[in-house]
Amino acid sequence: MTDVDQTPADGLSASPRPADLTEHSRTGMGAAALQRAIADHLRYSIGRPAAALRPEHYYRALALAVRDRMQDRRVASTQTSLDLGRKVTCYLSAEFLMGPQLGNNLLNLRMEGAAKTALTAMGQNLDEVLACEPEPGLGNGGLGRLAACYLDSLATLERPAIGYGIRYEFGIFNQQIQDGWQVEKTDNWLVNGNPWEIAKPDVNYLVKWGGYAEHYTDEAGTERSRWVAGRLLKGVAYDTPVQGYGVNTCNVLTLWSARAVESFALEAFNTGDYYKAVEDEVTSETVTKVIYPNDEPEAGKRLRLLQQHFFVSCSLQHILHIMDDLADAGVRELPERFAVQLNDTHPAIAVAELLRLLIDERHLDWDEAWDITVATFGYTNHTLLPEALETWPLEMFSESLPRHLEIIYEINHRFLDEVRAKFPGDGDRLRRMSIIGEDGNKNVRMAHLATVGSHAINGVAALHSDLLKASVLKDFYEMWPERFSNKTNGVTPRRFLALANPGLRELLDRTVGDGWLTDLDRLRGLEPFVEDASFRQQWRDVKRNNKARLAKYVLSATGVELNPNWLFDIQVKRIHEYKRQHLNVLHIIALYHRLKQNPELSIPPRAFIFGGKAAPGYFMAKRIIKLINSVAETVNADPDVNKFIKVAFVPNFNVKNAHLVYPAANLSEQISTAGKEASGTGNMKFMINGALTIGTLDGANVEMRDEVGGENFFLFGLTEDEVQAVKAQGYCPSDYVDGNKELSAVLDLIARGTFSHGDTDVFMPLVDNLCYDDPFLVCADYASYVDCQDRVSAAWLDGESWTKMSILNTARSGKFSSDRAIAEYCDDIWQVWPLKVTV
């Protein structure tokens, strides 16, 4: 008798008759129970007639069935944490780029086989069902993906945690390419609902905005303050379970959605003012519509500030509400029960908001409230770029958050007194460290607020942390050296190796066992197999299959046909001048120029693949996308060239198609200007999948090169010290252009319209920027980069040697697991320990 009877394909017209009915359909982990659960959800949750069922309905039913099992663990995890009084990490982030969750949750629950068996019995294909899941639009790039990796690792390491963020209704935009230009389209990811989230309308908090601060004397004669709001809105919680791998721990991601306090004004409706009847609802819900509204206009800037305050206030009120429910703890024990981490500067207003809640609403005195606040918060800095260290115009801040500004002034006054005491007579230092910026128009420096209000500050790569201490936060490091540390970023090997690269996962499991899924250092066991010719061939077979898979996707998405036998050279990341996608393009044009000048020239065939989004208001980044696509159009259509090089820009790069991209790369482009990339995580995702890196000594590249060995890394470019020296001497990019005939010829090809149908205007801003400004030293690094690319081509010709280097990149990637990073945060900053959960 089979484990699961073969039911009709609709899954409804007859109930499955499993051989073993002992497992409950809501909680059972076997194929039989799962099949019953899917059938139940198809009937009772989806409610479609059998004849109308499609793969997307099976996706939703399977997701709901998997969520049931996660909720069982979620409730147990919460209860265990409360019963034992364990400390919980709260991770505040404006982004959580979770990616499709069904495959990841099946992996972590170890239910992939059960799901495949159950769906097959119902006439469905698991891969087709997985493909139906939309990409949740909750993040923009590396920051949000890091937050998602960290939630995965917290659960896998059995550390109690809550992620807090915003439930963006439309999220990041969908990117389309029209005539080579990026066009932003609405990302309507919630159009069919989200089966993973559970709405919690009873978990809601009022958030104030505008108005004024009022000072009064209470009945005991104590002077107090309160915030009289000009406007109120309500935040409603939506909970998504986050399952750890191979454990019962299931944490939660709580996202806040904005609602009107009174959604419908009946009086206005009855008088015929139909817009006024719903005006408050429309205005309030705008707050959580879109991630990172364009902050060029004043209204966009205000909306960004409101978004940040909104989710921070809801989150802190929720944390304090949990504290109130704990029988054995009061608000004064907050730092012993919760560690709150600020993921970059977006949640920095939390410092002032927690003080307000403790002083104005809980009536603690300043000193006690301040000690609690500093002991509760940790701050992760993710950038060295000045524009990303958020500041808010003082006038706007005062109008929006009047009580917070008063609190910040008091923080600043007391803080600067400390600075004066430690560094007497140093007025310049006071001006540099002040939370209130006095240069030009006054502003509130959010990175300074986060630094002053946190007991721990960390960078995200060794070089980045050193640069923070030496430049951006130098004065603060000299003030409190004990607060600073480094926590190099990491990525989850569950999603970005096991899930994204099933062929390599199978090979790794056969070779070193499956322990690497939770201990990535075990991949060191691959090193003896580097000299095994049979293993190297298996490695190449896996890589070629992954390249064929990506080539199929690229063809469908762009119409560009790629040969899987070619070198796949890939750069996928947010489009930004400091990431230097245009340096990559200059090399492609140089190859084009060489091939056109010398028809007898033969080079190793290479496919250049790009992906990434530009911020809607970022003029130069959008022009770089146009240049990539224009060069692709010219190169791909030229028979003299297209037998050696092809170029493709994959639109709408996201976690879902990243599963195809990272495993297929032979060469990973990590070519930012030294000193500009805090860490990077895409570099790590390529590395664990066996790509070789061409890169500068920037961000985590430095540590990756240390781990894999310089002989297995293609290094080029100025170091951070050399970048500073070049700038100090008065950098003149035209000197580099004039001194390099090929670079001059490449820029001339762009300027005279070779890639723009003769239009000499379209790329002139980019050419002028490189020749006369070049803030990210593209011209200075060009010769070194092109020479390094020639070394790449030479290395590619020796397939056996390249394969050895590829294996070693994977074998030596253990440091870059998010499990290692989270263990360091838990041990060094949060003091959050493992908690076994039983179900």
Name each model-derived stretch.
Residues 2-839:
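A conserved ligand/cofactor-binding region detector
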